[in-house]
Every structure is written in C-alpha cells, then in structure tokens.
Amino acid sequence: TQLPDVPMMARIPLSQARLCDAVVDRPSSLSARAVNQLAQALLPPGITGRAVLVAPAAPGDFQTDLAVAIARAAAQNGRRVVLIDGNFRNPRVAHAIGVTNQKGLVAALTGRLRLSQCFFRDTRSAAIMLACTQGLPNPSQILASPAMAQLVAHLRGVCDLVVIDSGPVLATNDAAQLARLSDVTLLVCNRAPRETIAQAMRELGGTAAQVALVSMELPRAA
C-alpha cells in the first residue's frame, strides 16, 4: 500500500521502562532524548499557543504514553503545558500518571465546575492535566461542541503547548473532531499495517491542519 506523502516526525525507541517515566527517570536514554527532540520540534523557542493532537492509527499504539511524555518533556524545558484527555470512550491519562481525579474535563465542559477546579498537576512534572475519568454516552457530540472548541482556544491563549490525547483514528470520528482544533496531529504507529496507517491518514486529511507520523519502535528480539 502506498502511504500518502506525510513526514515521519520522530522514531521513538521503546524499552521496558514506560516512556512517560523515562523522560523523568532516564533523561539520557535514547527514548527520552527522542521525546525531547520531538517536543522541541513541536514547540520551537519563541512559539506559544500550539495545540498538538496525539492519535493512534490503531489500538495499542502507545499514544497516551507518548502524550504524557511530550507534556513532561516540554514542562521540564520550562514551557507551560496542559495535557487534555480527549479519549472520552477509554480515558487513560489519569491512570497513566497514577492519580484518581473525580472532577475532570467533562465537568468543565458542561459547566458543573469552573475550569480552574478541574486542573490537577502532574505527579512528576510541572505539566497541568485535564483528565476524563468517566465514560460518556455521547462523546462525539461533546468533542464537536462549541464548549470544547472554546476550551482549547482558551488554553492556547494562556499556555505554550496544549497536548490532546485521543482514541484510535479509525474507531470513530472523535480524533477527526479533535484534529480540527489542533495545529499538528501526530499519528502514532507501532504494529499497525500499512493499509491501516494509510486509511488513518486519509481519514485525517480533510480535517487536520498538519499530520506527521511518529513511529513507536519496540526492541527487536535477539
């Protein structure tokens, strides 16, 4: 299958350590250095207010681990970062960073709580998180709502980087909805077949301002 002309923005070597922890615990590792280079490419010096969507081509492609790692790497470099869990059907950010948060993004979008009441600080960096800890009956409707667009626009105005974690591109149109709100969509691929990657690119092509590939590479067996 011929892949569309989309740049490969990064190749991230994976190891036994979780990527989101490696950027903190093992900053000189190949994985951490690759994430830092990616974070710097996404947010060059002097640039602020960028929104980046991290979406997998297929389930199990480590996108949440990468989203948390990018947020932590940028925060360690002194940037103001917010990470949004936009995977309403299968939220993973809170679990990935080891917290239990009962407020979350949905309460802010529906007006039940002020936005400031829904933020919580990452346990291992200065990044701020907006988690989604509950299943929703109508996630696509909420993601496409004016409230979601206004939230992302507001955060872009006060932060250097907004990272949005998303579910698989081909499962629903959720990722495509979030791509409309983002400057760059990182399409994360690991073991997805080329046809799946090509189909995901086509799905994003009509909505995303820019799409770039990130390959998560498992170590090869000896």
Provide a role label for each language-model segment.
Residues 83, 129, 164, 186-187, ...:
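Structural beta-sheet core signal
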Residues 84, 104-110, 129-178:
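Switch II (G3) loop of P-loop NTPases
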Residues 50, 128, 160, 183, ...:
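Conserved acidic residues
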Residues 3-8, 174-188:
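Gly/Ser-rich helix-loop-strand patches that form or flank binding pockets
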Residues 165, 169-171, 182-198:
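Conserved Switch II/interswitch segment of TRAFAC-class P-loop GTPases
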Residues 1-68, 72-80, 86-106, 116, ...:
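Short boundary/hinge segments that flank catalytic cores
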Residues 122-128:
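Beta-strand-turn-beta hairpins that frame and shape the catalytic cleft
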